[in-house]
């Protein structure tokens, strides 16, 4: 709601920012709206901690310790969410249609507004409920003010003086319409430009009860705007301090729960063993004999960490607990994993199409892009439970053959034979199996590209994509940039813990 500053006193913004800085990062997060916490919780999937091994002895903890730990984790997750998600915003809560919660809310609200309508219809009118509403509106308007908004604060306090309003009601001198007019005017001053239209519509409502209902509806939207304004205000401070803040909060959690690095240790140990096994195989002589001691492969902490992050893109989120140090980004890693799986199938379909149909057909940029978008659209819901990849690939095979035949006809090339069409459909349908050789080649090349980009220190330009990935280069580079950004931020926060764990693992290896 940064627009609010432009609509009142711009010079007061500096005072407000200074006040916010004095409160500090901790205070800003401690006072965060409950809605923010709900969003963080909804964006973070369950850690699926099944069959948890304990590397540290179990100890009894009090309820207070658990609550304090949960509070620390929530604040850490909130700071992380705001920093990592550049467009982090709070949206108004929408209750599901037909839900019990929505039904109860509707019944309670209807009863309240009906009661207000009855009171105002009496002779003389009773203003008990109306005065309570004015009090709530007053508190809401005051909450929108910045520390420097002295004049506006005085106006609201003076006009919406509840004691004076009660006296006027008792003496039959209360003009509720005049109060509503002041409230709407003040809302127009404090609201973001995006709410101007809603506030303007309030002026056209003449009946008191519908007017108050509409006022509260717009005020709810303004609360969301204010929360988003607060987020945008503290984001620069978070960016400066988030690494130290997250590390400090995680250390507090670790001190209360010493086994909070169990899964991270397992993750790094598994990566070390897998990488060591790979390098050892490559170090073996061609004859298959044992490698000498001088040939023993050496691992570095960086190579193990990079390999460990790549393993997160093939994680079984339903059966394996996610490492604690990357838990707040589990949903992001999971999203990247799904995108890469879809890209592997998409790339494989395009590869077999261009190699089977006619080598020269891929040179037609418009056709290649059209074909890619068509296949991509048909694979959009690939990871929904209701999606059947076999059926989708059968449909894709039919459509691809039609597009290829049409393109060959327009180019004046030899027509697409029935034999080639049958082969192409069969190859596309075979991609439904994760073990299909072409699909596995695509996955291998995709991970080779990610590994190269990660090891390059995300320097520009990006590494050259391996052969066969050209048609999906744009999509792959977008995923790679997101992946490396996540990895580098995670390294900055948790590098001391990773270094401590890997120093022991590599020494033992």
UniProtKB/Swiss-Prot annotation:
Residues 16-30 have a biased composition (Low complexity). One of its GO terms (cellular component) is microtubule. It holds the Pfam family Tcp11. InterPro entries: Tcp11. This is T-complex protein 11-like protein 1. Keywords: Phosphoprotein. It comes from Mus musculus. PANTHER family: T-COMPLEX PROTEIN 11-LIKE PROTEIN 1 (PTHR12832:SF15), TESTIS-SPECIFIC PROTEIN PBS13 T-COMPLEX 11 (PTHR12832). Residues 1-12 have a biased composition (Basic and acidic residues). The modification Phosphoserine is found at residue 56. Residues 1-57 are annotated as: Disordered.
């Amino acid at each position: 709601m940064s627009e609010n500053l432009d609509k009142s006193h711009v010079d007061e913004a500096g005072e407000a920012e200074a006040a916010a800085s004095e409160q500090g990062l901790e205070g800003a997060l401690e006072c965060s709206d409950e809605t923010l916490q709900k969003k963080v919780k909804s964006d973070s999937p369950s850690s699926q901690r099944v069959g948890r091994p304990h590397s540290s002895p179990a100890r009894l903890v009090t309820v207070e310790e658990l609550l304090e730990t949960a509070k620390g984790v929530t604040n850490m997750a909130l700071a992380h969410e705001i920093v990592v998600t550049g467009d982090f915003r709070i949206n108004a809560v929408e209750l599901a249609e037909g839900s019990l919660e929505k039904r109860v809310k509707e019944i309670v609200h209807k009863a309240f507004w009906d009661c207000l309508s009855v009171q105002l219809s009496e002779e003389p009118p009773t203003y008990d409920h109306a005065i309570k509403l004015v009090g709530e509106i007053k508190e809401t308007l005051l909450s929108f003010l910045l520390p420097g908004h002295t004049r506006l604060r005085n106006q609201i306090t003076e006009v919406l003086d509840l004691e004076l309003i009660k006296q006027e009601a008792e003496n039959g001198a209360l003009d509720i319409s005049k109060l509503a007019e002041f409230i709407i005017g003040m809302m127009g001053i404090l609201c973001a430009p995006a709410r101007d239209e809603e506030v303007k519509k309030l002026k056209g409502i003449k009946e008191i009860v519908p007017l108050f209902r509409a006022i509260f509806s717009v005020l709810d939207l303004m609360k969301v705007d204010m929360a988003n304004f607060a987020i945008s205000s503290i984001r620069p401070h978070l960016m400066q301090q988030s690494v130290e803040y997250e590390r400090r909060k995680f250390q507090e959690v670790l001190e209360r729960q010493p086994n909070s690095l169990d899964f991270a240790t397992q993750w790094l140990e598994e990566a070390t063993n897998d990488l060591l096994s790979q390098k050892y195989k490559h170090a073996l002589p061609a004859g298959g004999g044992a490698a000498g001691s001088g040939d023993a492969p050496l691992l570095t902490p960086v190579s193990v960490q990079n390999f460990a992050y790549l393993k997160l893109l093939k994680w079984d989120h339903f059966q394996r607990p996610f490492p604690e140090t990357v838990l707040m980004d589990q949903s992001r890693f999971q999203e990247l994993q799904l995108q890469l799986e879809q890209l592997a199938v998409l790339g494989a379909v395009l590869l077999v199409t261009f190699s089977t149909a006619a080598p020269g057909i891929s040179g037609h940029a418009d056709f290649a892009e059209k074909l890619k978008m068509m296949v991509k659209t048909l694979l959009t819901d690939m990871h929904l439970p209701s999606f059947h990849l076999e059926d989708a690939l059968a449909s894709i095979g039919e459509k691809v053959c039609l597009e290829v035949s049409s393109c060959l006809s327009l180019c004046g090339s030899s027509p697409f034979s029935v034999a080639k069409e049958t082969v192409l459909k069969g190859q596309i349908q075979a991609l439904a199996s994760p073990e299909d050789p072409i699909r596995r080649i695509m996955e291998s090349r995709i991970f080779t590209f990610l590994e190269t980009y990660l090891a390059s220190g995300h320097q520009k330009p990006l590494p050259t994509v391996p052969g066969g990935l050209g048609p999906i280069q744009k999509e792959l580079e977008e995923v790679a940039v997101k992946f490396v950004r996540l990895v580098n931020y995670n390294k900055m926060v948790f590098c001391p813990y990773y270094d401590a764990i890997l120093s022991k693992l590599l020494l033992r290896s």
